[in-house]
Amino acid sequence: ICALCIQSILAQEKMFVHRSDKITQGVLLSVLDSMTFVNEAVLLHLHDQDAPTYSMTEIDSLSFGDNSLQIKILYSDTGIEIVNPLAFEGVSISVDDGNVIITSTISEEVEYILTGTISNGMFKIYSDKKFILTLNGVNITNADGPAINIQSGKKVTVNLTEGTINTLTDGKKYADSGSEDMKGCFFSEGQLIFNGEGALYVQGNKKHGICSDDYLLVNSGNITITGAASDGIHANDYIRIDGGSVTVTSDSDGLDGDEGYIEINGGKV
Protein backbone atom coordinates (compact mmCIF):
# COMPACT_ATOMS: atom_id res chain seq x y z
CA ILE A 1 0.00 0.00 0.00
CA CYS A 2 1.33 3.38 -0.97
CA ALA A 3 -0.23 6.63 0.19
CA LEU A 4 0.32 9.89 -1.67
CA CYS A 5 -0.37 13.05 0.30
CA ILE A 6 -1.11 16.07 -1.88
CA GLN A 7 -1.78 18.73 0.75
CA SER A 8 1.51 20.45 -0.11
CA ILE A 9 0.21 21.44 -3.55
CA LEU A 10 -1.04 24.75 -2.19
CA ALA A 11 -0.93 26.73 -5.42
CA GLN A 12 -3.74 24.72 -7.02
CA GLU A 13 -7.37 24.26 -6.04
CA LYS A 14 -8.27 21.00 -7.73
CA MET A 15 -6.92 17.68 -8.86
CA PHE A 16 -8.33 16.47 -12.16
CA VAL A 17 -8.73 12.76 -12.85
CA HIS A 18 -8.55 12.17 -16.61
CA ARG A 19 -10.38 8.92 -17.24
CA SER A 20 -9.92 6.60 -20.18
CA ASP A 21 -13.61 7.04 -21.15
CA LYS A 22 -12.90 10.73 -22.00
CA ILE A 23 -14.52 12.03 -18.82
CA THR A 24 -12.46 14.32 -16.59
CA GLN A 25 -13.53 14.78 -12.96
CA GLY A 26 -12.30 17.47 -10.59
CA VAL A 27 -11.70 17.01 -6.86
CA LEU A 28 -11.16 19.92 -4.46
CA LEU A 29 -7.77 19.59 -2.81
CA SER A 30 -9.25 21.04 0.36
CA VAL A 31 -11.40 17.92 0.82
CA LEU A 32 -8.86 15.40 -0.46
CA ASP A 33 -6.92 13.75 2.36
CA SER A 34 -4.91 11.31 0.30
CA MET A 35 -4.81 8.82 -2.53
CA THR A 36 -4.26 5.14 -1.85
CA PHE A 37 -3.08 2.59 -4.40
CA VAL A 38 -4.14 -0.96 -3.54
CA ASN A 39 -4.89 -4.08 -5.58
CA GLU A 40 -4.62 -2.24 -8.91
CA ALA A 41 -7.16 0.35 -7.76
CA VAL A 42 -6.95 4.00 -6.75
CA LEU A 43 -8.98 5.25 -3.77
CA LEU A 44 -9.51 8.96 -3.19
CA HIS A 45 -10.04 9.67 0.51
CA LEU A 46 -12.30 12.72 0.93
CA HIS A 47 -13.50 14.55 4.04
CA ASP A 48 -17.00 13.39 5.03
CA GLN A 49 -17.62 11.65 1.70
CA ASP A 50 -17.48 8.11 0.43
CA ALA A 51 -14.14 7.41 -1.22
CA PRO A 52 -14.48 7.12 -5.01
CA THR A 53 -12.56 4.20 -6.46
CA TYR A 54 -10.96 3.92 -9.89
CA SER A 55 -9.27 0.91 -11.41
CA MET A 56 -5.79 1.63 -12.71
CA THR A 57 -6.99 1.06 -16.27
CA GLU A 58 -9.65 3.76 -15.84
CA ILE A 59 -7.14 6.55 -15.26
CA ASP A 60 -5.14 8.06 -18.10
CA SER A 61 -3.51 10.81 -16.07
CA LEU A 62 -3.81 13.30 -13.23
CA SER A 63 -3.41 17.06 -13.39
CA PHE A 64 -3.86 20.06 -11.12
CA GLY A 65 -5.59 23.37 -11.78
CA ASP A 66 -7.96 26.08 -10.67
CA ASN A 67 -11.54 25.68 -9.53
CA SER A 68 -14.27 26.42 -12.08
CA LEU A 69 -18.04 26.49 -12.45
CA GLN A 70 -17.75 25.68 -16.16
CA ILE A 71 -18.53 22.18 -17.41
CA LYS A 72 -17.38 21.46 -20.95
CA ILE A 73 -19.01 18.88 -23.22
CA LEU A 74 -17.55 18.06 -26.63
CA TYR A 75 -19.89 15.96 -28.76
CA SER A 76 -18.55 13.49 -31.31
CA ASP A 77 -19.78 10.27 -32.89
CA THR A 78 -16.51 8.65 -31.84
CA GLY A 79 -16.93 9.51 -28.15
CA ILE A 80 -18.08 12.40 -25.98
CA GLU A 81 -15.46 14.30 -24.00
CA ILE A 82 -16.54 15.85 -20.70
CA VAL A 83 -14.67 18.04 -18.25
CA ASN A 84 -16.59 18.14 -14.97
CA PRO A 85 -14.76 20.03 -12.21
CA LEU A 86 -17.84 19.67 -9.97
CA ALA A 87 -18.10 15.88 -10.01
CA PHE A 88 -17.91 15.60 -6.22
CA GLU A 89 -19.79 18.81 -5.43
CA GLY A 90 -23.25 17.98 -6.70
CA VAL A 91 -23.02 17.66 -10.49
CA SER A 92 -23.36 14.09 -11.74
CA ILE A 93 -22.94 13.35 -15.45
CA SER A 94 -23.58 10.09 -17.27
CA VAL A 95 -23.27 9.20 -20.94
CA ASP A 96 -25.63 6.72 -22.57
CA ASP A 97 -24.52 6.27 -26.17
CA GLY A 98 -24.78 9.85 -27.47
CA ASN A 99 -27.00 11.10 -24.66
CA VAL A 100 -25.45 13.28 -21.97
CA ILE A 101 -27.57 13.24 -18.81
CA ILE A 102 -26.85 15.68 -15.98
CA THR A 103 -28.22 15.83 -12.46
CA SER A 104 -27.20 18.97 -10.58
CA THR A 105 -27.90 19.75 -6.93
CA ILE A 106 -25.16 22.36 -6.51
CA SER A 107 -26.20 25.76 -5.14
CA GLU A 108 -24.03 27.83 -7.52
CA GLU A 109 -24.96 28.89 -11.06
CA VAL A 110 -23.09 26.46 -13.32
CA GLU A 111 -22.24 27.08 -16.98
CA TYR A 112 -22.49 24.15 -19.41
CA ILE A 113 -20.54 24.72 -22.63
CA LEU A 114 -21.54 22.54 -25.60
CA THR A 115 -19.40 22.08 -28.71
CA GLY A 116 -18.97 19.46 -31.43
CA THR A 117 -21.28 17.38 -33.59
CA ILE A 118 -23.24 14.20 -32.94
CA SER A 119 -25.62 12.41 -35.31
CA ASN A 120 -27.74 10.74 -32.62
CA GLY A 121 -27.56 12.25 -29.15
CA MET A 122 -29.05 14.65 -26.64
CA PHE A 123 -28.29 17.09 -23.85
CA LYS A 124 -30.59 16.40 -20.90
CA ILE A 125 -30.45 18.04 -17.49
CA TYR A 126 -32.16 18.00 -14.12
CA SER A 127 -31.08 21.03 -12.08
CA ASP A 128 -32.13 22.40 -8.70
CA LYS A 129 -30.78 25.86 -9.53
CA LYS A 130 -30.70 28.24 -12.48
CA PHE A 131 -27.82 27.71 -14.91
CA ILE A 132 -26.15 28.97 -18.06
CA LEU A 133 -26.18 26.95 -21.28
CA THR A 134 -23.58 28.11 -23.79
CA LEU A 135 -23.89 26.85 -27.36
CA ASN A 136 -20.41 27.16 -28.77
CA GLY A 137 -20.67 25.63 -32.23
CA VAL A 138 -22.70 22.52 -31.38
CA ASN A 139 -24.74 20.36 -33.75
CA ILE A 140 -27.05 17.81 -32.12
CA THR A 141 -29.43 15.47 -33.93
CA ASN A 142 -31.63 13.11 -31.93
CA ALA A 143 -33.63 10.47 -33.78
CA ASP A 144 -36.02 9.67 -30.92
CA GLY A 145 -36.29 12.74 -28.71
CA PRO A 146 -35.41 16.40 -28.21
CA ALA A 147 -31.92 17.61 -29.00
CA ILE A 148 -31.95 19.67 -25.78
CA ASN A 149 -34.18 18.43 -22.98
CA ILE A 150 -34.24 20.59 -19.83
CA GLN A 151 -36.25 18.87 -17.11
CA SER A 152 -35.89 21.76 -14.69
CA GLY A 153 -38.25 24.58 -13.83
CA LYS A 154 -35.38 26.99 -13.15
CA LYS A 155 -34.23 29.88 -15.34
CA VAL A 156 -31.83 28.98 -18.14
CA THR A 157 -29.69 31.65 -19.78
CA VAL A 158 -28.78 30.45 -23.27
CA ASN A 159 -25.62 32.05 -24.65
CA LEU A 160 -25.01 31.83 -28.40
CA THR A 161 -21.27 32.34 -28.75
CA GLU A 162 -20.41 35.07 -31.23
CA GLY A 163 -19.39 33.75 -34.63
CA THR A 164 -20.72 30.23 -34.05
CA ILE A 165 -23.43 28.28 -35.87
CA ASN A 166 -25.46 25.89 -33.73
CA THR A 167 -27.92 23.36 -35.15
CA LEU A 168 -30.53 21.27 -33.33
CA THR A 169 -32.75 18.59 -34.91
CA ASP A 170 -35.16 16.19 -33.22
CA GLY A 171 -36.91 13.02 -34.38
CA LYS A 172 -40.43 12.64 -35.73
CA LYS A 173 -41.21 10.13 -32.96
CA TYR A 174 -39.99 10.31 -29.36
CA ALA A 175 -39.09 7.33 -27.19
CA ASP A 176 -41.35 6.82 -24.17
CA SER A 177 -40.25 9.13 -21.35
CA GLY A 178 -42.80 8.11 -18.75
CA SER A 179 -44.27 11.16 -17.04
CA GLU A 180 -41.66 13.59 -18.39
CA ASP A 181 -42.89 16.36 -20.66
CA MET A 182 -41.12 16.88 -23.99
CA LYS A 183 -42.75 19.32 -26.39
CA GLY A 184 -40.06 20.34 -28.83
CA CYS A 185 -36.60 20.04 -30.26
CA PHE A 186 -35.29 22.55 -27.69
CA PHE A 187 -37.48 22.00 -24.64
CA SER A 188 -37.37 23.49 -21.15
CA GLU A 189 -39.66 23.23 -18.16
CA GLY A 190 -38.36 26.63 -17.02
CA GLN A 191 -37.69 30.09 -18.40
CA LEU A 192 -35.45 30.49 -21.45
CA ILE A 193 -33.44 33.68 -21.99
CA PHE A 194 -31.39 33.95 -25.19
CA ASN A 195 -28.25 36.12 -25.37
CA GLY A 196 -25.18 36.35 -27.57
CA GLU A 197 -24.29 37.07 -31.17
CA GLY A 198 -24.17 33.53 -32.52
CA ALA A 199 -26.66 31.69 -34.73
CA LEU A 200 -29.09 28.95 -33.74
CA TYR A 201 -30.95 26.79 -36.27
CA VAL A 202 -33.71 24.51 -34.97
CA GLN A 203 -35.68 21.84 -36.83
CA GLY A 204 -38.70 20.60 -34.84
CA ASN A 205 -39.90 17.42 -36.50
CA LYS A 206 -42.09 16.14 -33.65
CA LYS A 207 -43.86 19.26 -32.36
CA HIS A 208 -42.51 22.74 -31.55
CA GLY A 209 -39.12 24.09 -32.53
CA ILE A 210 -38.31 25.81 -29.23
CA CYS A 211 -40.65 25.38 -26.26
CA SER A 212 -40.70 26.71 -22.71
CA ASP A 213 -43.30 25.69 -20.15
CA ASP A 214 -42.69 29.11 -18.58
CA TYR A 215 -41.67 32.29 -20.45
CA LEU A 216 -39.18 32.89 -23.27
CA LEU A 217 -37.11 36.05 -23.78
CA VAL A 218 -34.81 36.92 -26.68
CA ASN A 219 -32.30 39.68 -25.91
CA SER A 220 -29.95 38.99 -28.81
CA GLY A 221 -28.78 36.30 -31.19
CA ASN A 222 -29.88 35.01 -34.57
CA ILE A 223 -32.52 32.31 -34.12
CA THR A 224 -33.97 30.45 -37.10
CA ILE A 225 -36.65 27.79 -36.87
CA THR A 226 -36.08 26.01 -40.16
CA GLY A 227 -39.24 23.96 -39.70
CA ALA A 228 -41.66 22.83 -37.00
CA ALA A 229 -44.51 20.32 -37.01
CA SER A 230 -46.43 22.66 -34.70
CA ASP A 231 -45.39 26.11 -33.40
CA GLY A 232 -42.02 27.57 -34.25
CA ILE A 233 -41.52 29.08 -30.78
CA HIS A 234 -43.97 28.22 -28.01
CA ALA A 235 -44.12 29.42 -24.40
CA ASN A 236 -46.80 28.82 -21.80
CA ASP A 237 -46.56 32.22 -20.08
CA TYR A 238 -45.32 34.70 -22.67
CA ILE A 239 -42.78 35.42 -25.41
CA ARG A 240 -40.85 38.70 -25.37
CA ILE A 241 -38.37 39.77 -28.03
CA ASP A 242 -36.15 42.73 -27.12
CA GLY A 243 -33.44 42.24 -29.73
CA GLY A 244 -31.74 39.85 -32.09
CA SER A 245 -33.27 38.22 -35.12
CA VAL A 246 -35.99 35.57 -35.14
CA THR A 247 -37.04 33.78 -38.33
CA VAL A 248 -39.67 31.03 -38.27
CA THR A 249 -41.02 28.46 -40.70
CA SER A 250 -43.67 26.24 -39.11
CA ASP A 251 -46.82 24.22 -39.80
CA SER A 252 -48.76 26.11 -37.12
CA ASP A 253 -48.10 29.41 -35.33
CA GLY A 254 -44.78 31.13 -35.77
CA LEU A 255 -44.84 32.46 -32.21
CA ASP A 256 -47.36 31.23 -29.65
CA GLY A 257 -47.61 32.69 -26.14
CA ASP A 258 -50.30 30.16 -25.19
CA GLU A 259 -51.85 31.39 -21.90
CA GLY A 260 -49.94 34.67 -21.97
CA TYR A 261 -48.93 37.18 -24.62
CA ILE A 262 -46.34 38.07 -27.26
CA GLU A 263 -44.40 41.32 -26.89
CA ILE A 264 -41.93 42.60 -29.48
CA ASN A 265 -39.87 45.59 -28.31
CA GLY A 266 -36.96 45.34 -30.70
CA GLY A 267 -34.96 43.11 -32.94
CA LYS A 268 -36.11 41.66 -36.23
CA VAL A 269 -38.95 39.15 -36.55
What do these predicted regions represent?
Residues 6-11:
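Sec/Tat signal peptide C-region and signal peptidase I cleavage site
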Residues 12-68:
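Compositionally biased alpha-helical segments
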Residues 1-5:
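Sec-dependent N-terminal signal peptides
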Residues 67-269:
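A composition-driven surface/loop motif
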